[in-house]
A protein has these predicted regions:
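Catalytic phosphate/metal-binding cores of nucleic-acid and nucleotide-processing enzymes, i.e., regions
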Residues: 2-121
Length: 121
């Protein structure tokens, strides 16, 4: 029997994990742009945190995004537990990881960062 409350909770945790992953990728992107092109008002880390995620600057300082990565893993684990408990099958827990990857790709694609990632590689 499917328990929809745990399934919805698992999907919510996967969405939060995907958002944390997108923040991590943005921090890596801005650090890489700074190393390659130097300081610019368009891609500085301080401008990014001031305009987009001011709360995160106080909670997660510029440490390369490692603390955001830890938060992402916590929400991925919660999503896996909720999704596996919702249907009593361990295979459904992989949905959380796949959804996290898809949501990350959506955020990166919607912000138009994929071309910049190709240039940095």
């Amino acid at each position: 029997m499917i328990q929809f409350d745990y399934m919805i909770l698992g999907i919510l945790f996967a969405l939060i994990a995907g958002y944390c992953r997108a923040l991590f990728e943005c921090i890596i992107l801005f650090d890489s742009l700074y190393e390659k092109h130097g300081y610019s008002e368009w891609w500085s880390y301080s401008r990014f945190t001031q305009n987009k995620i001011g709360y995160w600057e106080n909670t997660f300082p510029n440490d390369g995004g490692h603390r955001i990565k830890i938060v992402e893993f916590i929400f991925d684990a919660l999503a896996c537990v909720c999704l596996s408990y919702s249907y009593d099958e361990i295979l459904h827990s992989f949905m959380a990881t796949m959804m996290s990857v898809m949501i990350t790709y959506f955020f990166i694609k919607s912000f138009g960062f994929e071309q910049t990632f190709k240039e940095l590689r």
